[in-house]
């Protein structure tokens, strides 16, 4: 969340940084385009036997590849090509495609579908393998995302994130909704609907739970929502503010910011709500904890130096080692997020009267702004570290945007109909 002046920093923390299943009506449309100077040309033929299906797997695969910004879809015509067909790879290379995809969707006796495909390298004139997936009416979209992930990894050498999920908060009128969607913003489901603010959703590393802060009881309380069952339970309802939940890499612990004894400090609590333990012992505001991927460190925001900056301490707390300042570019930095490989720090910096998303190399300390927007907040890395999702403002509305984490292309605004959207969190790889 964005924090303002030092006075505003304290006031906002004291109020838990207020800012703002059934199927969801509002859909976030996710698009990341223009990444890099070149895009990989690929032709994906219509999968055989798709007519009349509730979801067209071919369309999902093509859309995923296009919105990644890494691929150009070459027209493959309208004729279905099953994975068993003999393919003239030279002809597809002549049409400008460096890769070709063929596949089929077959309904089985039990009502499920068998989705098969094969990926070809038309330049080397060879198969790059494929998958055979089982799907239902409701998971055909997931099958399409998994196929796109396979293609992305085989051709680019990086694991794809199309089969991951997003969480975010949409405010329409006086109602807040915590929504969970596919990575393309489609298939959105409502996890919680309330007339009180919902903030700080955070995915568990397993991808099966989302922690968040709800004000439904007129004060900030940390909950965990179990996605497979739809059940939720309270994790932290201490005196004062309970805010900023962050999962440990093993999913057993949450770091939280509590004002239990006055100034907000960093604590840990077991995922079942027990074992509360204080980690920071400062007279300042310590908030927004975030674990490093290896579990050794907790990064956090503190004004102990006079203005908000990002620090890190051992995961066991300051009793195991003094906190060290990490950010030195800019006089006001908040909202730390660490890339999945542990090499990059994303944060929000106050710059020229606005707030911009920065990325810092943790080894060299070099930090650069990677957006052209000016009201940025709540950064979240994709599971492969290639992209960052964040909240910002456009046209007077709260929106989400996505940008390559290396800043190689300008951010793309993600649209949502009928409401303002913020508090994004990009989920992990699905197991």
UniProtKB/Swiss-Prot annotation:
Part of the Tol-Pal system, which plays a role in outer membrane invagination during cell division and is important for maintaining outer membrane integrity. GO terms for biological process: cell division; protein import. It is found in: Periplasm. Residues 1-26 form the signal peptide. The gene is tolB. SUPFAM superfamilies: TolB, N-terminal domain, Tricorn protease N-terminal domain. It comes from Burkholderia ambifaria (strain ATCC BAA-244 / DSM 16087 / CCUG 44356 / LMG 19182 / AMMD). Keywords: Cell cycle, Cell division, Periplasm, Signal. It comes from the Bacteria. The Tol-Pal system is composed of five core proteins: the inner membrane proteins TolA, TolQ and TolR, the periplasmic protein TolB and the outer membrane protein Pal. They form a network linking the inner and outer membranes and the peptidoglycan layer. Belongs to the TolB family. GO terms for cellular component: periplasmic space. Residues 411-431 are annotated as: Disordered. It holds the Pfam family PD40. This is Tol-Pal system protein TolB. InterPro entries: 6-blade_b-propeller_TolB-like, PD40, Tol-Pal_TolB, TolB_N. Disulfide bonds: none annotated.
